[in-house]
């Protein structure tokens, strides 16, 4: 088995190396070596000094009295954007040097590329409709950058729109001039003389030491990009930041914290978070297997391209041809804006679906490879806040619905009486019937036993399961529920499914607990109730009440409020706005999500109270509604707003004195938050892509004050939900739980042991907030980094409410 695991780890490395080599080879073959990892590094290093050199030269050359080819080039380039010009030059020069092209060819390539950029700008300005038609067609045909430019050039010649910029000699002068700057600025390109028979030519080459470096770098780059797969044996226990996870070839490349801030790993070495390591190791020891029946259905659906939900689209949506009124409209007109928005949405959708297709096919292939294994395992790591993540690529227990539907625990556990109840509740939750009591959910499952049986026995003929919110996990449930209910004693059924218990807007649960907020706590099920509280429904209901009041007033805006009231604000209209609040949500995000929800609902067929969908720029109704939703959120989750504001105030003081943030979580993890300013610019071209590069002449070692302030609340609350998860895993392990599916605020185990997990997660949450005043501890940590005279600038701790945190013990819908 160890030999098998060693082979698997080597395969992960080999797959990563092969993928990296293929990408580098493709870029080099198409003359785009500058797009390789080594090329990008050289570009970013060279671009800023090359731009500066160009700007200084042009300023001097334009006032010089002696006439030469370089002064002529300065006149030609006097209106060119320096960043764009040097981006084109550096990119082309590096690619030419890697290919050992002649100096003349390289210079002409630069001149031609720059000329095409100028031609495209002027072509669109003079004949926008034709330009867009040509480019849209070229992209739809999948043409590369060079052929797109050729198509644009031919269309211009055919239509006679504008005269092409620069003749051949001029392009050579421009390219030669810019190439000289590149050679000087990069320090990595040499011009060498080569003899071919009697003919001698000058060629561009990368310096030998640069070629050697790039080869070593690309080899190392491939090693650092493994394709993570499940392991054949339990992963190595984490004992230090550098030791754990993988056993063999990957072991020396892994650290327990991904993307740690400078100094954090040293802090963890000095103060090991043993509780966190214990939880990581328990999760790593959870054995998994592929759900063969779900895999068979999914594989057939994909191969036959059947119209089943929950999977990515197999084909791109076609890009529509603009109607005549769009082509005839003036540039910048509303009709043009609306059309561009529509087309952009399709492009974005297609790009997203292509990515999802790639991830899905990879997950499906991995599942097929592992389908014969009785048990496999996932290595786990954490981010700088302590949030725990599986390292599996595409196939892992924290994946989307179709991935989680493919996975089940290798170990089976008899349901028992409690387990049968939890299995039934789980089915109702997956279907979307999760706003009612547990009793009603279980009753729903019992009433739909026949539907579940039909879906399980013939999922292609009986498609009831496809109506579920999470269809692929629900199909797995149908199979087990059908089997259990077919037995004389369903409680004896041995279940392999992971039963999930989800927090109710978990970030707000934590903020309400730390400040003992009885209003917010009641809204997110920190107190007992006969059925689950719906914070999204509460916010929607409060917003509707405000709309009703404002619509009845004699004011110029009453018609807007009346329109929204008639439109109806339901939980879906406010859900995203509420969800993101504890994770750094602002009024700006509230406005954006409100606009999105409105557009989606109108697109789905709802009658628009304002006559036309929101176009984005001039509309008054959406900001007015967003303001009311934002107020209603604040009225519902008072403590969350107060705690977030307080955290930001403390952070402002710390950043004023140049101090990063450090705090220790209840699980014993030392967290660093130390965002630094990065001064960047982005160069965009029409045919050669874009590059974000550093301005090397500007400081990059300053604290990013704004980011420090806006990030502290989400990072702080994430560190707390991670602590609760760690405590829950460790406690439940002591009570007999042996397998977990944990996703931040969603806890899962076998149905037969869900009662234990439900009890322990409540105990851990209550004890965490009984034993820790997390805001006070955070404040003391900040004080320790500041001079004494700065302490007076720190705000007082926010006031606490009267919530009895022990009510969580009796709240059955706290995690449900």
Feature locations, PLM:
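C-terminal, well-structured subdomains that either form a transmembrane helix-short loop-helix hairpin
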Residues: 715-723, 728-732, 738-754
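Non-catalytic nucleic-acid-binding interfaces of large nucleic-acid enzymes and RNP effectors
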Residues: 1-578, 582-715, 731, 735, ...
């Amino acid at each position: 088995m160890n030999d098998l695991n060693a082979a698997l780890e080597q395969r992960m490395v080999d797959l990563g190396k092969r993928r990296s080599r293929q990408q580098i080879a493709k870029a080099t073959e198409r003359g785009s070596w500058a797009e390789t990892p080594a090329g990008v590094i050289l570009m970013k290093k060279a671009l800023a000094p090359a731009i500066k050199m160009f700007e200084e030269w042009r300023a001097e050359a334009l006032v010089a009295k002696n006439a030469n080819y370089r002064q002529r080039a300065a006149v030609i380039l006097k209106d060119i954007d320096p960043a764009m010009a040097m981006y084109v030059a550096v990119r082309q020069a590096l690619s030419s040097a890697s290919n050992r092209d002649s100096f003349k060819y390289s210079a002409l390539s630069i001149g031609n590329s720059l000329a095409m950029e100028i031609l495209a700008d002027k072509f669109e300005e003079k004949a926008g409709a034709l330009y867009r038609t040509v480019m849209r067609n070229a992209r739809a045909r999948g043409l590369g950058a060079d052929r797109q430019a050729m198509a644009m050039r031919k269309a211009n010649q055919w239509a006679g729109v504008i005269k092409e910029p620069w003749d051949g000699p001029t392009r050579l002068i421009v390219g030669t001039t810019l190439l000289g700057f590149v050679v000087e600025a990069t320090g990595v390109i040499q011009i060498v003389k080569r003899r071919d028979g009697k003919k001698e030519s000058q060629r561009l080459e990368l310096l030998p030491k640069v070629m050697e470096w790039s080869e070593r770098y690309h080899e190392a780059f491939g090693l650092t990009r493994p394709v993570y797969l499940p392991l054949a044996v339990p992963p190595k226990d984490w004992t230090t930041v550098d030791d754990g996870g993988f056993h063999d070839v990957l072991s020396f490349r892994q650290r327990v914290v991904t993307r740690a801030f400078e100094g954090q790993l040293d802090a963890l070495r000095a103060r090991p978070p043993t509780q966190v390591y214990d939880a990581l190791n328990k999760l790593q020891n959870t054995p998994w297997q592929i759900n063969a029946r779900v895999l068979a259905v999914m594989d057939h659906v994909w191969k036959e391209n059947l119209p089943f939900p929950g999977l990515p689209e197999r084909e791109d949506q076609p890009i529509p041809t603009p109607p005549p009124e769009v082509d005839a409209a003036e540039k910048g007109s509303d009709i043009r804006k609306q059309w561009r928005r529509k087309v952009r949405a399709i492009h974005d959708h297609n790009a997203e679906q292509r990515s999802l297709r790639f991830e899905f096919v990879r997950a499906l292939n991995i599942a097929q490879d592992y389908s014969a294994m009785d048990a496999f395992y996932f290595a786990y790591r954490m981010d700088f806040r302590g949030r725990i993540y599986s390292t599996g690529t595409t196939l892992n227990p924290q994946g989307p619905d179709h991935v989680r539907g493919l996975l089940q625990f290798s170990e089976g556990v008899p349901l028992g009486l409690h387990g049968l109840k939890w299995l039934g509740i789980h089915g109702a939750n997956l279907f979307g019937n999760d706003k009612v009591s547990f009793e009603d959910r279980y009753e729903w499952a019992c009433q739909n036993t026949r539907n579940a049986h039909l879906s399980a026995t013939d999922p292609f003929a009986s498609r009831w399961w496809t109506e579920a919110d999470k269809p692929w996990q629900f199909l797995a449930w149908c199979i087990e529920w059908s089997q259990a209910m077919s037995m004389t004693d369903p409680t004896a059924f041995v279940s392999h499914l992971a039963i999930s218990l989800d927090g109710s807007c978990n970030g707000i649960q934590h903020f309400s607990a730390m400040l003992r907020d009885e209003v917010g706590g009641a809204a997110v099920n920190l107190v007992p109730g006969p059925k689950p509280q719906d914070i999204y429904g509460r916010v929607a209901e409060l917003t509707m009440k405000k709309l009703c009041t404002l619509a009845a007033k004699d004011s110029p805006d009453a018609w807007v409020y009346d329109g929204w009231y008639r439109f109806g604000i339901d939980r879906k209209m406010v859900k995203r706005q509420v969800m993101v609040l504890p994770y750094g949500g602002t009024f700006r995000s509230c406005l954006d999500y409100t606009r999105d929800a409105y557009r989606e609902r109108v697109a789905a067929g709802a009658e628009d109270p304002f006559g036309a969908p929101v176009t984005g720029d001039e509309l008054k109704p959406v900001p007015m509604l967003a303001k009311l939703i934002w107020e209603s959120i604040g009225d519902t989750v008072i403590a969350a707003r107060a705690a977030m504001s307080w955290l930001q105030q403390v952070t402002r003081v710390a950043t004023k004195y140049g101090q990063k943030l450090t705090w220790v979580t209840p699980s014993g993890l030392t967290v660093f938050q130390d965002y630094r300013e990065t001064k960047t610019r982005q160069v965009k071209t029409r045919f050669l892509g874009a590059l974000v590069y550093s301005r090397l002449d500007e400081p990059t070692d300053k604290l990013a004050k704004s980011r420090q302030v806006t990030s502290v609340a989400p990072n702080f609350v994430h560190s707390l939900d991670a602590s609760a998860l760690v405590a829950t895993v460790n406690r439940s392990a002591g009570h007999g739980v042996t397998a977990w599916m944990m996703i931040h605020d969603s806890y899962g185990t076998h149905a037969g042991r869900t009662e234990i997990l439900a009890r322990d997660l409540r105990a851990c949450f209550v004890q965490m907030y009984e034993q820790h005043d997390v805001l006070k501890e955070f404040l003391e940590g900040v004080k320790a980094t500041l001079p004494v005279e700065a302490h007076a600038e720190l705000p007082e701790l926010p006031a606490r409410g009267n919530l009895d945190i022990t009510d969580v013990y009796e709240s059955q819908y706290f995690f449900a």
